[in-house]
Amino acid sequence: DIYVIEGKNAYDIVKQFRHVIGRSYIPPKFAFGFGQSRWGYTTKEDFRTVAKGYRENHIPIDMIYMDIDYMQSFKDFTVSEENFPDFSEFVQEMNDQSIRLIPIIDAGVKVEPGYEIYEEGVKNNYFCKREDGSDFVAAVWPGDTHFPDMLNPEARKWFGDKYRFLIEQGIEGFWNDMNEPAIFYSSEALQRQENLPESLQRIPEARPIPGKCRTRCSVLQIIRK
């Protein structure tokens, strides 16, 4: 189809165009700014030192990314109580300096009995499966890990809702990482997978999907804010 749009000016044409395709999400202003990302920042003092260095040297800084060390044992949607005992207050402290903290969220959920997200995922069959129907296990940063099935709408909503934990503490953006999904090793890593039923999707064939779905999960939660 070809659309011809007439308008009084460029603004009017853009307005009509957006009416055709739907309104797009407008990122927050800070997202267009400068960010600092480095593995190894573990405590509040690490982040304070980075922020101070930028300010004292008159270098723009709008975001500091938080790698996996802010978590409790590298578990998604957790914060180390030892290193960040008052996390929401620290987030506000950085916000007062016009610096947003952007925490990483990895694609895998640690296999750990008693870990709420793991227990919920197993109970509701939200994780990717092997051909025999058992939950797929691979090793990533936290050790043995399950991966939320982003082709399952219920699993997507469930995983997306977990972002609220951080949003409610003042977080306004996320670093969704390891969306390939990345794995270090698994029992199937060196085995050929052939003759799977059509209803089963090999990971290489589905690789573009998890990242897209996880981005959608997090953005929808931020918009809800």
Feature-to-residue mapping (PLM):
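Catalytic-domain carbohydrate-binding cleft regions of carbohydrate-active enzymes
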Residues: 1-225
